Structures are given as C-alpha cells and as structure tokens.
Amino acid sequence: MKVDLRKVPAVYMNLKQHTEKNEQMQSLLKQCGFETIIRVEGPYRPENPPAGCAGAHYVGVCEIDPPFVLFEDDCQLHNFKPVIEVPDNADAVYLGTSQWARYWQFSGPFVHYEKYNDEIVRVYNMLGGHSILYLTQDYVRMCQRICHHHSEIIGYNQDPGFAEVQKYFNIYSMNDPFFKQSGYNEAVTTCKVTDVGIHISDAQRFFDSVKYDLARLQGVPDLNRAPSTYHPLRIV
C-alpha cells in the first residue's frame, strides 16, 4: 500500500504556553509538505507531566478518524520521505523510532523486530510516540483506551501501554526514522532499528537467557549509556 504522507492529516500536540514549539512544528510540517495541519492541546498537568503527555495523546487520537499522523512537539526532521510503501495489513507505522522498549516490566534497549524489507520492520514492544502514522480504527480505539487509562487512572505516559499491545496488532516502523526527538533522546531516536534491536529469530534465546535471572535486564546501557531499569506500572 502506497501512502503519500503529505496528503495524510498531520496532528500535533502542543500546550498554549509553548509558543516556540508551536512555531517550530508549523515550520517543520509545512517544510515536509503536509497539506492538512491540525494543532491539539492536551491537559496541562505540571504536577504530573507524564499523565499530561498521555492526556495529550488521548486528545490527539480522538481528534479525527484515521489515517492521520500524530506528532509530539519536540519532533525534528531526520530522514523524511514523503511517499512510503507500507504493508497492506498495517495498523500503524512508527515514523519516529526508539531504541527503548518494554520487556518483562523493564524499560530499556530491548526492542524486538522482524524485518519486512530494507526500509520497514515490524515491531513488537517499542516505546516512544513522537511520530506515529495511524491507519486503522481498531488500533486507534485501543490507543484511545490506553491513553485514557494511563492519563486518568495510573497517571503515567501512554507509550508503555502501546508497547505492551503491539504484538496483538500489525505495527510497523521505519527502520531509519523520518523524525527524531530533540535533546537527550536524540541518540536513541536516530538509530536504525536493525542496528540496535533483537530480531525475532533471536527472541527465544534472549528470553531463555534472562527468564531465571531477571537481574540481567537491569542496567543494560543504551546508546546514551543510560541504563535499563525495572519499572513496573500499577494496574489501577
């Protein structure tokens, strides 16, 4: 399935006080050639920014029916291509990627992938959410539920919830990301998934190597030398 991203609505999340980021996103999206640009504003929660982030994603995924691309306002250009060929069964495609993933209640550089072609991989547990192409209503509805639960019930970012359900959907990612995050996360959002991830052919071996020694999942460094961490989230 060929997708001209310029003809897909671009929705970006931005708080009204972040005027500089608003200007940067308008400039970036116009530079990419997006024909429809929509700004949405999530809840301002200075006492709990992760919950605010999840709330913003909730507003974003409820704004319009798919297809649409949802952006966080710290996005920057990396290797953007306006026209892509994606699998016909895709529920979503991550245009911005991350080395980080969820694995057995740990967050760290454990992203599992399967190569579709040189440009696209299927992902099973990837964290991050700075640029995602949403394609099917079924998946959007799931993400709406996750965002609401994370924002209103447990008060945390939505991307662990996204990562934990990816294996139930057909979620793909650009191997070489189109967009990156600025600042500290730049290194882990500009790498190729195939350079840093765990291919599914190696998933069983990796699982067997840690299942009776979960301490091996603690302190694994990413490209920034930031360590993986045990980070369980409460249910309610």
Residue ranges and their predicted role:
Residues M1-F71, C75-V236:
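An acidic/histidine-cluster motif and surrounding catalytic segment
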